[in-house]
UniProtKB/Swiss-Prot annotation:
Keywords, in A-Z order: Cilium biogenesis/degradation, Coiled coil, Cytoplasm, Cytoskeleton
Protein name: Coiled-coil domain-containing protein 15
UniProt GO BP: cilium assembly; positive regulation of centriole elongation
GO cellular component annotations of the record: centriolar satellite; centriole; centrosome; cytoplasm
Coiled-coil region: 65-89, 160-189, 638-669
Protein location: Cytoplasm, Cytoskeleton, Microtubule organizing center, Centrosome; Cytoplasm, Cytoskeleton, Microtubule organizing center, Centrosome, Centriole; Cytoplasm, Cytoskeleton, Microtubule organizing center, Centrosome, Centriolar satellite
Oligomeric form and interacting partners: Interacts with POC5, POC1B, CETN2 and FAM161A.
UniProt function note: Plays an important role in primary cilium assembly, maintenance, and length regulation. Interacts with centriole inner scaffold proteins to promote proper centriole size and integrity and assembly of functional cilia. Required for the recruitment of both the inner scaffold protein POC1B and the distal SFI1/CETN2 complex to centrioles.
Major site of localization recorded for this protein: cytoplasm
Amino acid sequence: MPGGMAPLKKPRNPTKLPLALNPTKSKDVLAVLAERNQAIIPVGAWVEPASPNWSGIPAHTSAYVVEEEIKEQQRRKQESLRHFQRQVRHRVNQRVKLRKKQQLHKSYKAAEKEGSIAMQYSDLAHLSSKRTSVFPSNLNAAVGRFRLPTSQVLGDAIEDGENQLFQQQAQALSQTMKQARHQLASFKTVSEKKTPVLPNGGRKGCPTQEGLGCGKISFVAVSEERDALFVSCQQDFLSEDKEKAFSKVQKVKFKNPLSVVIKEDERKQLHPHSLQAVLPEAQDYFVEVQSGLPESQSDVIDVQNVEPKASRIEPKTLGVEPDTQATGVECQTTEPEGQAVKTGIQDVPKVQTVELDGNTELEAQDFLPSHQAFLSRDTDCLPNCQYQDSLPKGHCVLPNYWNVLPKYQNQHFLPVDQEFLPRNQLALPKEQNHPLQCQKQDLLPREQFPLLLRHQDQREPHVLPKCQEHDVLSKAQNYLHNYQEQDLQLQNQEVNSKEPLSDITDGKGREIFSLDMFSKKPSTFMRRERGDEELPLDSPQCAPPQIQDQVFLREQSQQPSVRTAERWQEDLYLSGHECLPPRQRRDTCSRQQQVYEEYRSGLSTEQQALLAFQSGVDQEEDKKERQKQYLRHRRLFMDIEREQVKEQNRQRERKRRIEKIKKKKEQQRYAEEQRLLRMNCHEEPYSEEKISDVLAQLQLEEIKGAREKQQQREKEYIRYVEALRAQVQEKMKLYNITLPPLCCCGPDFWDAHPDTCANNCIFYKNYRAYNRALHSVINSSDISEGNATLRNAIRNFASAHRRTPKQSLH
């Protein structure tokens, strides 16, 4: 250019710094940008710590400020955490203190309640036993003191004051309890020989008829109150601090509690023969022990003008020993004057035969006036105060030990010149003064007829047993009624002295039923659960007096049927009069016979029903057994069928495989057969053209076969050469032998190969040239003698390439 002026260069733009690193920007802009961005922890790679007073690059200053802020935040967090922990600890301590105060308050309330209970029952004589601990050994355990941990010491002064106040109150309560126990100890235990004094001031004895119920109830109530108070005192008073101070306190204890007496009574009931050692003079007196209400109106017997002499009863019962005082309470069962004594059949046979101790038995003849007869429920003996003028002079009187007759028997006392008395004649001996025990038992069950005794020929000749008459006796002849006529007329007595015992007939001339009729059970025995029990057949009348008093006869409690209630009442009414007209007696006998026939029909019906029921049960059991057997057989056959199905499946599969094999063999056989047929068949002579075609075809097939074999051989040889090539290459690398490259297709000697070289290379598809080059290189190379293995491998490799079959192909 003219003038030699150089071209003007554009000045470079100054480097733009970031906004955060530009010191020319105001601090307000930096603050706004800092508020937008989140706080970033500085990285030590490019941020260096700077001194507080150093004013340099703003980036260093901002990093320092951020670090300080982070430290301040961590400090505030730790401070808030410590403050929260202190608050939690404070609240926990307050909760513990509040719970302790509540526990102390509850203990104080419990102590006040114990004090009020102790003051309320301090006047009772049976508070607790001698060894019962009223106070535990530790007062703190009684008041439930809460033991605080040693670390909690806040507010100990207030708590100590409260504990001291509570201890003073507990001490005052202990003093009150001490006074109450001393008052209890002031009572004395009553002597064993006297009647115990109850808390209400009464005496436990045999009261009169009017006061019997309340006395028994009060005794039971006192026993229950004593047991309940004893348990409550044992549970409430837990302190044992004053146990030694009150160890001398005595308990007012009854000689024999009610439970012991009841157990003794039950033992005596279950073992009636344990009273054999009772004195003979005490065995003649019996007590009425059953006071059951009647179960039907037909069993009610009126006893007129029964005057209970309670004043005569009480002195006899005051001397009863404590072991049988509870039994003595139940022995008075008579009603006041003017009331009718109702007797019934008890439902519980166990209570019907209670035998009491000889010390508690009373003279039952004191209950009745001199002109009344009291009928017992279990005996047929006459009372002790009936007129004795009904006995003729010619009657034989039994000795003293035969005065008490057994239960359920019609005792007929015969004169000297007579063997039997009539059925309606019931005579009373002079010395029969003592009724049997259980005088409230007056009626047998209506369905129950007396059975014949086995040893009737061993009895005394003057005593007629209860079943001596073989006819069916009426109900009135089995029981002694209280309205018996005292002046018996001897002209109405019918004497059957010439007839033997087995041929007795009734008033109408009918023959007596045989023994087999009475040996069967009544129908009602089969209706009851205990239907297999009969009355004992052994008669106690021939036994000595001690054994007679100990006979334990059980009374069946069957109710009579409703349809014969009126008939039984009428029979019972007629049986009360000894002197009946013959017509009424015949009516009674006919009705009696009708009732017996009804019982026999009922017996047969019940037996048939029982047999039908038993047969039904057997049929049901047989049905269940057949059902079980059917189910067993069904399971067995089902298993057999399953096995058969499995076997059939196996057979079918085997058959299918056999068919498949047969089909294949058949096809092969058919092909062979067709071939043989074609060979054996006569064909037309071939023409020359056809023969030449066949030969050409055969040649082509041979060439094709040879070519396939050659290709297979070449493939195997190529694989062998490649393996040998890899082996030589590895060994040469192992011995650090480096060969020069054969061509320019690769930098290495092994890169030259006819299959991999380029199409402009001399070795491309030229196996012969490659083999010559390879042999020349191997032969010109100097391999040490020590590498004999490598040398042999290289020679084999070269010879293999020399024999490459592709040489002939190319």
